Design a protein with these regions (language model features):
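Hydrophobic membrane-insertion alpha-helices, especially the h-region
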Residues: 9-30
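Membrane-embedded segments
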Residues: 58, 65, 69-149
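Histidine-centered active-site loop/cap adjacent to the catalytic His
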Residues: 288-319
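N-terminal Lys/Arg-rich, disordered targeting/topogenic segments
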Residues: 1-9
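Secreted/periplasmic serine-hydrolase-like ester/acetyl group-modifying domain
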Residues: 120, 129-231, 319
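Alpha-helical transmembrane signal-anchor/signal-peptide segments
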Residues: 31-51
Length: 319
């Protein structure tokens, strides 16, 4: 048996296979919507790819950040049509906690950004950083640098990436991955598949009194932005009022939560908008307990634009 010849042939096939797989990963990342996998969340990876491509093309004065409360409940076009923002980019992704919002912003060039809008709900302040697999590699990618290590790691994850990408990309559900030009995913009510469980869901909330430690990641985010001369705007999104009133303990917590944020905003000098109280939406604006349809997203964003215009006017008056 010609072992040397066999090993040489085997080695050649192995090198050829790895090279072909490597080129496939590179090609998919460059020429399709399939993202490189930097995180445990394929939806986050899709947003990371989108964000890098957008940031390479132009600069933005306003970033939208957060979980699906920002991804689905903000209509960036409304902001751009107002006088408060010219170029808006939505960097949000499903399930991003406040800690992960700060982590991502630390990897992004903020030199042209004047305002960051954090659209949130009470459950976004809980949770630590856990989605990013290799923070150093992701930071290199966001700077436009070559990430050879990640390309090779993605060869092994290619079957899983294909499966997860096509599993999650379902129009008319909360899992839809196709962003508009700003990075939003606004839900069109017609044809939307309303999930009965999510319509009646009250996510877990703390049963102990709130203090600053509950908002430590928000405070760290605010400090990070203030150091760079960037305004932070925090929004509490609407929640189905019927659900709030159905649980006395939750109702008490929800109002305590919004009151605490209001007080905190005055001390820490960020803009706070309690959109739940100000809009007082009925069920016709919701697709589940706390996600809005496209009309609800437009109205919420118009409220934000109007409030920021008032803030800008009051500051001019103070000069």
């Amino acid at each position: 048996v010609d072992y040397a010849g066999w090993l040489k042939a085997w080695f050649g096939y192995a090198v050829g296979f790895v090279a072909a797989a490597f080129l496939l990963v590179v090609g998919l990342e460059h020429y399709t919507d399939m993202p490189l996998r930097f995180t445990k969340s394929v939806s986050y990876d899709v947003k990371i790819k989108f964000a890098r491509e957008q940031l390479e093309e132009k600069s933005f004065d306003t970033f939208i950040v957060g979980s699906s409360m920002a991804l689905n409940n903000i209509d960036s076009a409304v902001l751009e049509s107002s006088h408060v923002s010219q170029h808006v980019l939505n960097l949000s992704s499903w399930g991003l906690a406040a800690s992960e919002v700060l982590q991502f912003l630390q990897m992004v060039d903020l030199s042209d950004v004047r305002r960051v809008i954090y659209s949130s709900q009470y459950f976004d302040y809980q949770g630590e950083v856990d989605k990013v697999l290799d923070e150093r590699e992701l930071a290199r990618y966001m700077k436009g640098q070559w990430v050879l290590k990640t390309y090779f790691q993605n060869i092994a994850r290619l079957p899983e990436s294909f499966m997860r990408y096509f599993e999650e990309d379902h129009q008319g559900t909360q899992r839809y991955l196709k962003f508009d030009e700003h990075g939003d995913v606004n839900f069109v009510r017609e044809g939307f598949k309303i999930n009965k469980h999510k319509w009646e869901e009250i996510p877990p909330f703390p049963k102990t009194p709130l203090d600053d430690s509950y908002f430590k990641h928000l405070l760290a985010l605010n400090d990070y932005l203030k150091d760079r001369g960037i305004e932070l705007v925090v929004i509490t999104n609407p929640f189905r009022q019927e659900l709030i009133e159905s649980d006395e303990e939750f109702q008490s917590f929800f109002h305590t939560h919004t009151d605490y944020l209001k007080r905190l905003s005055k001390v820490q000098r960020f803009v706070y908008i309690n959109a739940h109280a100000e809009l007082n939406f009925d069920d016709t604006y919701f697709v589940d307990a706390y996600h809005l349809d496209e009309t609800g997203a437009q109205r919420l964003t118009q409220l934000v634009a109007d409030r920021l215009e008032l803030v800008r006017f009051s500051r001019v008056q103070d000069l």
